[in-house]
């Protein structure tokens, strides 16, 4: 596979060396992140069968140009599918073309194939829809429910901040009002009925619930050759990457259906043995966005996939100022949860700071193949090594200082990478859950435990709705009791450790105090940022004392709390706060003059439009 750009979009081309082509249309928002490994797995399987496959991010999503709050995204998304079709047919030489869409991607694929909008109907031979969104209004209700479920678990300050969101926000992904209105108006059954032309064949893979049967009947009424299959693996597919599994049966169904429809010749059969050569790391793929340039790069010995975001007036041979490595959050691809990493990188580029957002092995596009089970990636030694390798790569380019940053598990990888490599001079850790991951502790066990700080639970005692949720969900109180007990023990143990340190005691490197001591000895500065009720502050309290006193004697560590910052940094206000703090830290610690103006510019920079970049057809 190799990176490509077209019309402001960034994607991947899996070369199958036959005349058969497939365009994979991803879903929107968090669903696109959660199903990224599914999209990649389908592409890899089809390429092994000799089919040329393109997958890409729509305008204003993923690594593509544009801000997700921009107007015109509905038309731009459909237009990007037309651009992809033209590219495969005209430049790659594909003759037989199938569109494959997942959830909202199936809706957009159908709209493009049916010729909705200003573009003439393209020549699409077949279409595959996995769990298709049929009625936009119902889809938006589902998204609202998902976000409301999350919002109900947050503090009053965060809920209040979300009431001021400029547009619909679903787990950090913004859906502007005109896109909401456009989606509300879509009913694929009506589209099928009125379309001047439709693909000749269609495969529907549908969960038990949904409007798939209605779409099936509408297609039959237009004479389309429709095959319907159940999507029994759906409940374990649409989950975050640490809990989801690849729907292997559904993937087999898609691949077999497409391959069976492809003409088989001796030349095609031979091509399947040599399909999709590995990317050699060379990339002429660059996205020029007025005041910055982004380039897909292969990083380090493991050839990690990354995006190097540089100010437009910077040349890689003459780097100046600091560079920042942005680690993955959990198993989300490098664009970040809620696309935070892209916002952060582009805000920094505007004030002269270069960033590298990477996929560690097993996440996004790094690694040999898409992983089925990604739960072992988070908090792994390999992830830490990959962040360290990315820092070494930037230092080898000549950047005088490299800083690593991340949220939650990304913060952990950044912190421990600084222990492993001298290339890192600073760490910005946002909502760091644990300073050290205990041996034998599984991610699944942690996910089943509490999701609040002890202080948060004391505040929740007065909220009858929280009590109701505990009873209805049959939550286990024991983790909360253990946390309260650990905080009580810390009132005694932390002062003892501080006294011992003054008389020469040295904590082990595999302990929280040992990690922070090692970084301080090497003159690595660290900024810790937490939401005011984030569970991670309990780990600070257990090992370093009360928040208001922790690190007060340290010249290398600063700690910030903010009531409007949620754990994953979904909110627009929290996003601006975190970006502002990061810019201040770079200005203060890195002595980088351009970044010194960032404290005042951060909120505006984070939200600026990319109006100068075309997000439609080029």
What are the roles of these predicted feature ranges?
Residues 1-20, 260-322, 571:
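N-terminal cap/lid segment of alpha/beta-hydrolase-fold proteins
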Residues 92-103, 395-408:
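Alpha/beta-hydrolase fold nucleophile elbow
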Residues 72, 122-222, 226-251, 255, ...:
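The alpha/beta-hydrolase serine catalytic core
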Residues 38, 69-91, 373-396:
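Alpha/beta-hydrolase active-site loop
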Residues 100-110, 131, 405-414:
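Gly/Ala-rich beta-loop-alpha elbow adjacent to hydrolase catalytic centers
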């Amino acid at each position: 596979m190799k990176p490509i750009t077209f019309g402001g979009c960034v994607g991947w081309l899996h070369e199958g060396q036959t005349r058969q082509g497939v365009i994979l249309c991803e879903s929107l928002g968090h669903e696109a992140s959660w199903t990224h490994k599914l999209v990649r797995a389908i592409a890899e399987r089809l390429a092994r069968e000799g089919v040329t496959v393109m997958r890409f991010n729509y305008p204003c999503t993923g690594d593509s140009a544009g801000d997700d709050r921009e107007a015109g995204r509905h038309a731009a998304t459909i237009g990007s599918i037309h651009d992809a079709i033209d590219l495969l047919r005209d430049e790659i030489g594909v003759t037989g073309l199938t569109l494959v869409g997942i959830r909202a991607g199936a809706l957009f694929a159908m709209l493009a194939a049916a010729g909705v909008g200003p573009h003439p109907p393209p020549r699409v031979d077949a279409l595959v829809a996995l769990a298709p969104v049929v009625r936009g209004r119902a889809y938006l209700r589902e998204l609202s429910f998902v976000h409301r479920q999350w919002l109900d678990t947050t503090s009053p300050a965060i809920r209040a901040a979300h009431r001021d969101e400029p547009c619909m926000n679903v787990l950090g992904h913004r859906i502007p009002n005109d896109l909401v209105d456009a989606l509300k108006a879509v009913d694929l059954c009506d589209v099928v009925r009125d379309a001047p032309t439709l693909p000749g064949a269609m495969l529907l893979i549908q969960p038990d619930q949904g409007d798939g049967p209605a779409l099936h009947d509408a297609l039959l009424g237009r004479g389309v050759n429709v095959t319907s299959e159940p999507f029994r693996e759906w409940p374990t597919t649409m989950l975050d990457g640490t809990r989801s599994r690849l729907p292997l049966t559904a993937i087999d169904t898609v691949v077999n259906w497409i391959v069976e429809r492809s003409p088989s010749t001796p030349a095609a059969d031979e091509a399947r043995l040599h399909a999709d050569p590995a990317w050699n790391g060379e990339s002429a793929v660059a996205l020029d966005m007025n005041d910055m340039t982004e380039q897909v790069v292969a990083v380090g010995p493991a050839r990690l996939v990354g995006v190097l975001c540089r100010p437009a007036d910077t040349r890689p041979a003459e780097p100046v100022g600091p560079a920042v490595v942005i680690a993955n959050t959990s198993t989300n691809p490098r664009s970040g949860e809620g696309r935070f990493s892209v916002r952060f990188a582009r805000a920094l580029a505007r004030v002269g700071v270069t960033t590298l957002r990477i996929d560690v092995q097993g996440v996004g596009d790094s690694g040999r193949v898409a992983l089925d089970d990604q739960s072992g990636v988070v908090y792994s030694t390999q992830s830490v090594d990959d962040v360290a390798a990315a820092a070494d790569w930037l230092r080898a380019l000549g950047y005088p200082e490299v800083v690593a940053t991340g949220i939650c598990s990304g913060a952990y990888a950044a912190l421990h990478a600084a222990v492993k490599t001298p290339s890192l001079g600073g760490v910005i850790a946002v909502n760091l859950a644990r300073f050290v991951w205990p041996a034998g502790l599984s991610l699944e066990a942690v996910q089943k435990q509490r999701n609040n700080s002890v202080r948060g639970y004391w505040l929740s005692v007065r909220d009858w709705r929280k009590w109701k949720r505990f009873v209805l969900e049959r939550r286990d109180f024991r983790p909360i009791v253990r946390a309260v007990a650990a905080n009580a023990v810390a009132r005694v143990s932390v002062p003892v450790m501080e006294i011992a340190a003054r008389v020469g005691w040295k904590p082990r490197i595999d302990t929280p105090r040992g990690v922070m001591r090692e970084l301080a000895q090497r003159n690595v500065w660290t900024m810790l940022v937490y939401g005011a009720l984030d569970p991670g502050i309990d780990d600070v309290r257990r090992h370093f004392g009360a928040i208001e006193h922790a690190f007060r004697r340290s010249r290398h560590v600063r700690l910030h709390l903010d009531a409007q910052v949620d754990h994953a940094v979904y909110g627009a206000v929290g996003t601006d706060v975190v970006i502002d703090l990061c810019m201040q830290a770079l200005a203060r610690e890195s002595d980088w003059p351009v970044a010194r103006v960032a404290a005042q510019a951060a909120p505006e920079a984070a939200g600026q439009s990319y109006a100068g970049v075309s997000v439609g057809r080029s």
